Amino acid sequence: MALEKIIRESLTGFIQCHIPHADLSALDEVFYAYATGVLEELGSQNSSEEDFEMESFVEMLEAYIPGFSEISSGKVYDMLFELSRRLSEARGKENVSPKPTAEVSFMTPTSSSTESSKKIETEPLEGAVAQEKDDAKNGIDLLLEIFPSCTVSQAQTALSMAKGDLEDAVQIIVDGKVIADNHSGSKDLQGAPKTDDLKDFILQKYMLVDTEDDKKTYRPVAPKEAPKKMIRYIDNQVVSTKGERYKDIKKPESEEMKKTYINLKPARKYKFH
């Protein structure tokens, strides 16, 4: 965090010095990550001014801060190398290991300020220890629920052998690597449950399996047949009520056409008395 603060303060100060009315709100985390990478390259032992790509850096800054390209490249070089030097010094100070707290406590006199600092340091440690205890208790309860014949001491042993990993602890109990505690007076572990029995137990307790549905045979209901249509229509007129698919239709003829027909029937013979 100290290095990031140095980068932010140096870049914002340099920009405000040369562009007083610049909008610094556009500088986001992506920009500072890019600037950090550039400064790390400059701080390396193999880097030099010739290897540094000034044009790409200026284009990047110009996209965030309009008018940055008008600043001379020499000033930008000086600012970057000075900032890189400051960052390397800050890293060197951070890498220096602090003195042990025990020696400092013997050298400095006891006071209210030192006691308050010790309390502040011990509070996070106590919280972490309490969190670890809660996790271990939850893991032991889960192991006892999965393995009813397992004792608390055996669950603690399996969890410690697995270094807190529940899956490894379950595998250790299944393999029978846990030795019964004779001092506690509890019964010996009567062998780890078989894998099939364990699976059945877990499925029965934590999983809903509908076995009756697997035994059923699916028989779809046949669709009902619609009654046969007996009425036939042509041009929205009923032509049949018996359901024929074909029908002879006589075309209507005009009166003039009827006059052209010849009647071939023989004339009637009339008898006169």
Curated annotation (Swiss-Prot):
Keywords: Cytoplasm, Nucleus, Phosphoprotein, Ubl conjugation pathway. It comes from the Eukaryota. Residues 135-178 form the CUE domain. Its main location: cytoplasm. It is found in: Cytoplasm; Nucleus. GO terms for cellular component: cytoplasm; nucleus. Residues 92-121 are annotated as: Disordered. Transmembrane segments: none annotated. Phosphorylated. Disulfide bonds: none annotated. Signal peptide: none annotated. CDD domains: CUE_CUED2. Belongs to the CUEDC2 family. May play a role in targeting proteins for ubiquitination and subsequent proteasomal degradation. This is CUE domain-containing protein 2-A.
